[in-house]
Amino acid sequence: GEMVRPGVTTKQIDKAVYEFILSQGAKPTFLGYGGFPASTCISVNEVIIHGIPGNRVLKEGDIVSVDVGATWGGFTGDCAATFACGKISEQAQKLITVTEQSFYEGIKFARQGYRISDIGHAVQTYVESQGFGVVRAFVGHGVGEKMHEEPEVPNFGSPGRGPRMVKGMTLAIEPMVTQGSYEVRVLKDKWTTVTADGKLAAHYENSILITDGEPEILTVTEGL
């Protein structure tokens, strides 16, 4: 997060994260995953997810989502947050704040005995009450020995559906929120996913553990 500032390239951020992950004795999960060429996904402005780090220079007013996966001791953690690059618009800041808060609204229902869709219902209800859209084309997921495991965890839908959560489950909860329409488009590189209307998007994610009480957050995205 501290590296998100005007004049920095997305590739420089990726390199710093790569070196940090290795310094902790972990492996960057994304690197080579499905052929992905980097250790992080860095998604700027209208890019929602899966932005490929490169020579793009960040500028004042950009919003920048950094998504990171690391594998250590056989377990994979997946997390993301969206950061302001310098001074951003009030509406862009609201989008970032609502996206992060929607994660916390969702995990109020990430408890033993509740159903998976209770999380997404809470996320969608909160996000839409704030005037934003929730991406449907991509969802959260189970996480553990592999990065993507069952069950899928949508950020939308009716409550009371899907498997019941049980103690010991590990889930990646990741609201992807748009300023306008929730429709998306994947670019020719087959990775970069943008809002169809070109408006801003934000992403926030942590991996959590279902316990017999409140869920435990396993990844900490503050400052990433």
Outline where the language-model segments fall:
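Active-site neighborhoods and metal-handling regions in enzymes and metal-associated proteins
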Residues: 1-224
